[in-house]
Amino acid sequence: MCDDDVSALVIDNGSGMVKAGFAGDDAPRAVFPSIVGRPRHQGVMVGMGQKDSYVGDEAQSKRGILTLKYLIEHGIVTNWDDMEKIWHHTFYNELRVAPEEHPVLLTEAPLNPKANREKMTQIMFETFNSPAMYVAIQAVLSLYASGRTTGIVFDSGDGVSHTVPIYEGYALPHAIIRLDLAGRDLTDYLMKILTERGYTFTTTAEREIVRDVKEKLCYVALDFEQEMLTAASSSSLEKSYELPDGQVITIGNERFRCPETLLQPSFIGMESAGIHETCYNSIMKCDVDIRKDLYANTVLSGGSTMFPGIADRMQREISALAPPTMKIKIIAPPERKYSVWIGGSILASLSTFQQMWISKQEYDESGPSIVHRKCF
């Protein structure tokens, strides 16, 4: 189907960031925020050439005059017109390729609604005229990127987290657990607890500043109670951060209280089990014979697993839940922020994968529902 000289494109559409590039590369060429910004006010200056919408980094840099909207909520696309804008921007501005010349591998959230997969397929073939495409589940790609075909992936991005047990390359749908708690909720929580300290962050632009604070200064405590005592009795855990306007803020126990929410969702009023329990529950829904393989291959993936200390804490918490003799191994690859994309890059460049693409011809014969037959 595909000639060897045409490289496939790999696009991982996350709730927070789009990662895009060419199959066979070891990292994405383009990484930009999944946002579309629209001007808050009608332009007054004539001839300024103000656009009616801005995408990605350009929207980010003009955030002072725009209203920013993330169009992928909890991993699921909610606004297809904006999604088309983002894909258009990816092809033409970021990768500078003609979409009709390259097969495209897209990623989707586990348990993505069927209608959504069909819509993605339809847009690729009808709007962008792709010669071929494929839709792969994000967590499965992360597992491939870690060099495994069996394991449980805890994938946590900006909009949603999932625990996905995978056996011999196939996700086990009955055991997948979705947790609507991820990076964006942590950012919102950090905004809230910084307000208690007397700093106010309210606008969409200020939220981006707080996200940066979170990424640079937060970490997961090995023992939360102990860490709280340390923070209360000394200032050794305090760090300062300079805001864009030059004002300096100091942040103390917020540094680990923010990501602790992943383990204690009650912090933000969610009645859900923490990520350690969710992993355990997911494993317990699987056949008793494969649990040992899952415990020993627990792979972290996604930007919200980048907090220092998260792997040690998960190891400790899951060990407390699992049978005492069980060997537990948490794998936290350094490039896990992009492991979904890297897995896609690996998959799309395998010679054995080339017969898996959905071709334009197959799409024309069967319509969008072909995606359920070819991608699973």
UniProtKB/Swiss-Prot annotation:
InterPro entries, per database record: Actin (IPR004000), Actin/actin-like_CS (IPR020902), Actin_CS (IPR004001), ATPase_NBD (IPR043129)
Modified residues (N-acetylaspartate): D3
Any one GO cellular component localisation term in the record: cytoskeleton
Record keyword ATP-binding present: yes
EC code(s) of this entry: 3.6.4.-
Family: Belongs to the actin family.
Propeptide residues according to the Swiss-Prot or TrEMBL record: 1-2
Catalysis: reaction(s): ATP + H2O = ADP + phosphate + H(+)
Alphabetic keyword roster: Acetylation, ATP-binding, Cytoplasm, Cytoskeleton, Hydrolase, Nucleotide-binding
CDD domains: ASKHA_NBD_actin
Enzyme class: hydrolase
Protein's name according to its UniProt entry: Actin, cytoskeletal 2
Annotated GO MF terms: ATP binding; hydrolase activity
Tissue-by-tissue expression: Embryo. Predominantly expressed in the aboral ectoderm cells.
Subcellular location: Cytoplasm; Cytoplasm, Cytoskeleton
Protein task: Actins are highly conserved proteins that are involved in various types of cell motility and are ubiquitously expressed in all eukaryotic cells.
Keyword Glycosyltransferase appears in the UniProt entry: no
